Curated annotation (Swiss-Prot):
One of its GO terms (molecular function) is FMN binding. FMN binds at R125, S126, S127, N238, A239, G278, K293, P294, T295, S296, S297, R319. This is Chorismate synthase. Keywords: Amino-acid biosynthesis, Aromatic amino acid biosynthesis, FAD, Flavoprotein, FMN, Lyase, NADP. The keyword Nucleotide-binding does not apply. It catalyses: 5-O-(1-carboxyvinyl)-3-phosphoshikimate = chorismate + phosphate. PANTHER family: CHORISMATE SYNTHASE. Homotetramer. The keyword Cell membrane does not apply. GO terms for biological process: amino acid biosynthetic process; aromatic amino acid family biosynthetic process; chorismate biosynthetic process. PROSITE patterns: CHORISMATE_SYNTHASE_1, CHORISMATE_SYNTHASE_2, CHORISMATE_SYNTHASE_3. Pathway: Metabolic intermediate biosynthesis; chorismate biosynthesis; chorismate from D-erythrose 4-phosphate and phosphoenolpyruvate: step 7/7.
Amino acid sequence: MSGNTFGALFTVTTFGESHGPAIGCVVDGCPPGMSLTEADIQPFLDKRKPGQSKYTTQRREEDKVQILSGVFDGKTTGAPIALLIQNTDQRSRDYEDIKNLFRPGHADFTYHYKYGHRDYRGGGRSSARETAARVAAGAIARLYLKRYLNLDIIGYLQQMGDLKLQFENENEINKNPFFCPNNKQIQELADYVDRLRRQGDSVGARVKILARGVPTGLGDPVFDKLDATLAYAMMSINAVKGVEIGAGFNAVEQLGSHHRDQMTAKGFLSNHAGGILGGIATGQPIEVSIALKPTSSITTPGQTINTEGEEVTVVTKGRHDPCVGIRAVPIAEAMMALVLMDHYLRHKAQCK
């Protein structure tokens, strides 16, 4: 199985399965001399880890990270940084009844026909459990970008199902389990999730990610445009079905006289381009939105086939998120950080 490594100079290779003994990653290309401890990485993992509230999956993982290499006396050495996270709350028996079935909307069918032999427990390698390793790697990138460039990344929930959230206060985002920027809508979100659980169903979401303090010039045309890399990175996240940069699909209805980001001696007058022109960062905030589908792991019975091609009914018994978009926020932040870190090192290698 190929395709487990991301990046050009700052690379991340993840490994492990949902119900295996552990997951982890190897980060290569981190500059030497940066202070780094497990305690630096842990808060980012705590933000993503399951079982923190009744509104997400009830699988409970501590997600304690171990640094195995690449750090000596509290500083990075420039060598590959290996990170390990133990899986401690697997419940593989939940999947015994469906090991020979293809869950609708999941990778079971495609993994079976591509590889012939798959780990059916919790989706194996295709599970969003893998993203914990991305968040750990992204933490290293975020720490570097913040300390050396004063670059900040923030993500939040924009919409859950048909409930659109009004942006009120950035300080509210990390004070609630929904990463919602409006404390007046928290109860609406809570009621929505409770209703989904009772119905045995799920719903999609829209998440926005912002990066501020991005140096002008990051990005490499033509195939490695910054926005192209961001779209590639975001689409690699489980359940993501769409990516917008800046105005995104709203640009279809805009006139050129409105969409163009006019400039003055003091700077740009708007940011419909989302901080990127010609694939290169303008220095404005980078704005990315992602659309996530509703998870197919629901208790409502559904039609499918088994490995013999016979039609059967399936009910998923595992512990799952009614809305995967909630915990996608820290994952998308991590992918933004990995892209920007990689492009920053590439920019330094080529330009002054």
